[in-house]
UniProtKB/Swiss-Prot annotation:
HAMAP family in UniProt: Met_tRNA_synth_type1
Keyword Zinc annotated: yes
Annotated motif 'KMSKS' region, positions: 332-336
An annotated GO BP: methionyl-tRNA aminoacylation
Subunit record text: Homodimer.
Similarity annotation: Belongs to the class-I aminoacyl-tRNA synthetase family. MetG type 1 subfamily.
Gene3D superfamilies linked: HUPs, Isoleucyl-tRNA Synthetase, Domain 1, Methionyl-tRNA synthetase, Zn-domain, Nucleic acid-binding proteins
Protein name: Methionine--tRNA ligase
GO CC terms: cytosol
Residue span of motif 'HIGH' region: 15-25
Amino acid sequence: MSTNSRQILVTCALPYANGPIHLGHMLEHIQADIWVRFQRMRGNEIYFVCADDAHGTPIMLKADQMGVKPEQLIADVQQKHMADFSGFNISFDNYHSTHSDENRELVEAIYHKLKQNGFIKTRIISQLFDPEKAMFLPDRFVKGTCPKCKAEDQYGDNCEVCSATYSPIELISPRSTVSGATPVLKESEHFFFDLPAFESMLTEWIRSGSLQQEVANKMQEWFEAGLQQWDISRDAPYFGFKIPNTDNKYFYVWLDAPIGYMASFKNLCGKKSGIDFDSFWSKESHAELYHFIGKDIMYFHSLFWPAMLDGASLRKPNNIFVHGYVTVNGEKMSKSRGTFIQAATYLKYLDPECLRYYYAAKLGSRIDDLDLNLDDFVQRVNTDLVNKLVNLASRNASFIQKRFDGKLADKLDDKMLFDEFIAQSELIADYYENREFGKAIREIMALTDKANKYVDEKAPWVIAKDESRTDELQQVCSMGIELFRVLIGYLKPVLPNLAARAEAFLNTQLTWENVASPLLDHQIAPFKPLFSRLDMKKIEEMIEASKIENAKANQTAGKSAVENKAFSEFEPIEESITIDDFFKVDLRVAKVLKCEAVPESNKLLKFILDIGNETRQVFSGIKAAYGKPEDLEGRFVIMVANLAPRKMKFGMSEGMILSAGNGGADLYLLDVDAGAKAGQRVK
């Protein structure tokens, strides 16, 4: 390791230990892995750790539903997670669990430090309590009628129709989603972290200029709304770590989860000599610390986590790198359409490096959603990697092997072209460093086109027919292989398996530093196929397999729901109504003329609808399900046309758009068959 190398610790968000890894998860882990592999190629001392997030009410309830102990559930899930990450070549130095001795010790130590420094407060709060299950109910395990807009079946913390936020005790007609019972109000002493005490420090962190602008802007919004003390405790029964010196209080999962980063690294330090835990986590640390996370957990990582570290006299992250969501063919991943694809399912049908390349080609440093367009996926992989990159090696290697026994020429045929390729090294490195992977890929593929143009113009297949041009043939084909070597070196962080096969063929190891050193008078190995074409049939098979797997999962959930209503996918049928009651509801086919996000709301989309003889403005709380509202323009929806207009903060809503699902990202707009027209009544 160079004496000038950087010391870096990188983490990914911890996958929750109650379900499988899917292609949405893989975006983050691939993004982080590419960055880590690049840093290794640059000679930096870097460690890459992660763990399963293994505590909380959902895990406790799912284990109970399955008839196993939570410890068994999380152990089984962890093995599957690790297999998925290994299959996608995610090169963790350590993968651990938050349910570990290291994490318990660190959680208790940080808690004691926060308490000692005066940042832990206690007070009595009133909570909803399930009398049948004898448990306090987290916000998301209570449903009822919104106290603001009177929308039914809303969660205990916010309304997905009007975007109002409220306390669970404000819900009208609340019910427990665990047992179906009507909860009662019960008092309990809770422990709070004094987040407002850190507003000055967090404001200064924003102004450092290192955070993504979108993150800094969002943090500023939270400051303007006012920071609140954070409840870090939960009452028994709960699966997690007990708060010291209490009888029935546990640390909230979001307190111990980020500390899991530290625990995984501490576990690594115990297994590998020469790594000093404190040199990475002490207040005086000069090491770099980066967290790769999704935008859905930005709140915890940009506010609570740095404040908690600062309050415990530990170092803060240098940065948090936030990414967007994955959509498939322009829509959110769908279980019914088979585009909710588990990592394990993908690995049964396709090469993981295809997805690594495609994600890299579309990733930038902003918090933008990434669309996995399956047609474009096939075309881009086959064009870039097979037709251009790998073909560059194969079309030259055959001549070198047959005519020159695998020996490359002792000089470059076109040194200016070689120097041009090497001159791009630092630009490409800069793109990698700043997570502008898409720009790096575009630069590399532009060089690939130049390399193929060189071979096309030199036409070695023509030169080979002239015995007097033997030396020229060796130099031209060697030059083609040299350019291939440089390109593979640049792509090694993205395509480690392809790079390993190329290294075996080239009979050399590729580092960022030695890319500039040509292989003159060098022996290469016989060429073997390096990469296979993507077949759309295999993708179609994968989609069908996903549909079947998702259907089986739903069936299993349905059976379990008989025993435990918390995991029921379907709500009970409402009380019967008369036909006259039904006819009072005027349902109409509506065409979406315009759709846009409401900037001030996390839930709402604003629609302008054509209902035949007039247009209507309607607000709908489906933003989480449809991340690209403009894609909805031109399609038909079903709306309640005779619902009384409701004045909202953002304007008048003149109806309601119908959708099915459980809320949040799990919502699906109702559609009509071809031929239906705007304004027609649904009967």
